[in-house]
Regions:
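Short beta-strands and strand-coil junctions in structured, solvent-facing domains, enriched
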Residues: 99, 169, 186, 283-285, ...
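Active-site pocket scaffolds in enzymes
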Residues: 62-64, 107, 113-122, 296-311, ...
Length: 614
């Protein structure tokens, strides 16, 4: 288990620190004070409407070993880009890497040609070429950008975006800090992926031991313990499969610094600080808290929410969260972000004095998955059909009512989306979900928006959940969809295969939406992994109950969970839709969504009046 690295400062950061220090000499500030006042991540902030970014390579030393990284303007993370809502930005991106690259502007509303996904938006940026992104800035808030080519995101191609609103900021603060969380490995990510394909549990060093078995004998009895072991062995799974890639190979970073690097933000007691958390990791869910200091959420995924005080939150991969903290005491506080599987943590410090630090909490014990607590009390497992008659599963559901929501819409087969298999209801399993690519199917998915998640349910303090939140100002769009699409999140952990509805991207056809239609997308997680699902170019308005919506760009779906969000297909083009766990996306949990004009003859009316399965 890896939780820290040597104290030596990599040359890259030493040189960067000299440059920042020189900038602040005329102000009479130390480099640390300059960083704190300007809200630096350790990378420079670039402001304006025209930017030049260079994608390249550099050697970095994060763990005591010098390893190659991909960089933006020579640094990891890349520079923070600060824009203003209503401006038009121009970004000239030059690729000095020996392979095709790209930049995707995560969560931004823009023309699809500017979205930065090779094969969908454009051809990518070839070595030695420059691509110019230009688009109007239609929103404000905290976002981020990253490569959408290969595994370059894992090796350092990511950075933060702050968009200032064109109207006065409703939350006045004294300091504004970006906090980028990420995961770094000295291994080549291609090797990591190849290892997962061969042995999916390779990086899990929290597996049960003989001592665990003996302890369970004492607590549960021999018979129940053996039954539990037999169940998990039959499923070819483990109750400790919380993360595919762990602290065995990962070092967890805060603003590019390892735990021993201890990224630090200085404040004056009594100040209001805005902390902009960005989970820019490839594979890691972080549980974030600041012992001794309350947080109040004001934005999620760049969108304002009704403020809610809390003490801890699980931030999914690719999500952002803006909070206000008001440290009044003359003391230091630890920013603590442990991985979901408790194999490591990122750490930083808020302090009134650079000489002061705070204790670092011990990590929690690794939590255990349970089929009941995950809503999987009635799971089917294995590649076979378990004696069920699936010949009746592939039938036309036209006219059948779907009653999972107050605004229910009927199901129908959609001729424009041929691989949307019909079902009796959202929890039924289509014929495509039986085969070598799917090793488990939930029969009783639950609504879990109020569930903090595995490892956080027994806290003595407030853990923030989706159910606590709603977009400020009320629903941002209609609550009434014209149709519903159902997607099951599927996979085979032992073979490291991931998909939607049992169909990997290589075999899937694009999902088609008509321009400006309102669609409900229902996700059912049939796997025992947590998945962050990201739809490019369009908002996902999560239905949190009582007519409330939470506007997001990335939605985390827990094991055995069923949730729904509403999408307004208001921008034409070809959009990516995928799990934001990098290796899951590469292993097949990816779809193309095409937003097209409706036929002029009105033949789409039937299509728009029915729901269907994806």
């Amino acid at each position: 288990m890896k939780t820290a690295d040597p104290f030596s400062l990599p040359r890259r950061r030493f040189v960067q620190g000299l440059a920042l220090g020189a900038t602040g000499l005329g102000l009479g500030l130390t480099p640390g004070q300059l960083l704190a006042r300007q809200g630096h991540t350790g990378a420079p902030t670039l402001s304006g409407d025209t930017f030049h970014l260079t994608l390249g390579g550099a050697d970095v030393n994060i763990t005591g070993k010098t390893r190659p990284a991909t960089t933006i303007n020579g640094i990891v993370p890349g520079p923070t880009l600060r824009w203003r809502e209503g401006d038009t930005v121009t970004l000239k991106v030059t690729n000095m890497l020996p392979e095709t690259s790209s930049i995707h502007w995560h969560g931004l509303l823009l023309p699809f040609e500017m979205d930065g996904v090779p094969g969908l938006s454009f051809d990518g940026i070839k070595p030695g070429e420059t691509f110019t992104y230009r688009f109007p800035v239609k929103q404000s808030g905290t976002y981020w950008y990253h490569s959408h080519s290969g595994f370059q995101e894992q090796t350092g191609l990511y950075g933060s975006i702050i968009i200032d609103p064109k109207t006065p900021e409703p939350h006045a603060v004294d300091r504004d800090q970006v906090i980028v969380l990420s995961d770094w490995s000295d291994e080549d990510p291609k090797h990591i992926f190849a290892t997962l394909k061969k042995l999916s549990h390779y990086y899990n060093f929290n597996e049960r031991t003989v001592f665990d078995t003996l302890r369970d004998f004492r607590h549960k009895g021999v018979i129940q313990t053996l039954k539990d072991r037999h169940m998990w062995n039959t499923m070819r799974m483990s109750d400790r499969d919380l993360a595919d890639v762990t602290g065995y190979t990962y070092t967890y970073l805060m603003n590019g610094q390892s735990p021993n690097g201890n990224w630090t933000c200085q404040f004056n007691p009594g100040e209001r600080l805005r902390l902009r958390f960005i989970n820019a990791s490839a594979m890691t869910f972080f549980d974030i808290r600041i012992p001794g200091l309350d947080m109040t959420v004001i934005e999620m995924d760049g969108q304002p929410v009704k403020p809610v005080p809390f003490h801890e939150v699980r931030l999914g991969v690719a999500e952002t969260l803006d909070v206000i903290v008001e440290p009044k005491a003359d003391q230091a506080y630890t920013l603590f972000a442990q991985s979901i599987d408790r194999s490591g943590f990122a750490r930083g410090t808020l302090t009134p004095n650079p000489a002061m630090s705070a204790p670092v909490p011990e990590m929690d014990p690794p939590p255990l998955l349970g089929h009941t607590e995950m809503g999987m009390g009635a799971m089917q497992h294995g590649d076979g059909h378990e004696g069920m008659d699936h010949g009746q599963m592939n039938h036309n559901m036209a006219g059948m009512k779907h009653s999972d929501h107050g605004n229910a819409v009927p199901f129908a087969v959609d001729p424009n989306n041929p691989d949307l298999p019909p079902r009796n209801n959202a929890t039924d399993h289509a014929a495509t979900e039986y085969g070598p690519g799917v090793d488990m199917r939930t029969m009783a998915p639950g609504e879990m928006l109020a569930d903090p998640g595995i490892g956080l349910r027994d806290r003595d303090w407030k853990v923030l959940t989706y159910a606590d939140l709603e977009t400020a100002g009320g629903p941002p769009d209609s609550l009434h969809p014209e149709r519903e699409i159902v997607l099951h999140l599927t996979g085979n952990m032992s073979r490291y295969m991931w998909s939607f509805n049992g169909i990997p991207f290589a075999d899937a056809v694009p999902l088609e939406l008509y321009h400006n239609e309102r669609v409900r997308i229902t996700l059912v997680n049939d796997t025992m992994m947590t998945h962050p699902i990201h739809l490019h170019g369009l908002w996902s308005d999560l239905e949190v109950g009582d007519g409330k919506l939470l506007r997001k760009h990335t939605v985390t779906v827990k094991p055995g969970e069923k949730l729904s969000y509403l999408v307004r297909a208001d921008t034409l083009g070809r959009w990516a839709y995928h799990c934001h766990l990098l290796y899951h996306m590469d292993a097949g949990m990816f779809r193309e969504v095409r937003v097209v004009e409706a036929p002029a003859d009105g033949s789409h009316a039937h299509h728009g009046a029915h729901g269907e399965d994806a």
